[in-house]
Amino acid sequence: MPNYYSTSDLNLASAIIVSWYQLSHIQKDKGKGLFFFEPSHKLAKFTEDYFLWRIRLDPMEYSGSIKTLKNYLYNTP
């Protein structure tokens, strides 16, 4: 299994997805998720920019992504 970038931060995972990075898989544990993405230099830069408040996202896409991930976490076995 390759090394992945992972985060348990739902908001960060949603921002990454909205920015067209491919979600590899999700590990669920008691309603919480660990989100895995293929690593890349662009993703590392995006994550840094996210925490420095440097990114711009479409608010509707972002909130939709959060909703979709929450539904997956809470409504799938």
Give a label for each model feature.
Residues 2-32:
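N-terminal acidic leader/helix
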Residues 5, 44-77:
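C-terminal basic regulatory modules in eukaryotic proteins
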Residues 11, 25-27, 40-43, 52:
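Alpha-helical interaction segments
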Residues 20-21, 38, 49-52:
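Surface-exposed beta-strand edges and their flanking turn/coil or helix-capping segments
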Residues 30-32, 36-38, 42-46:
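Acidic, low-complexity, intrinsically disordered interaction modules
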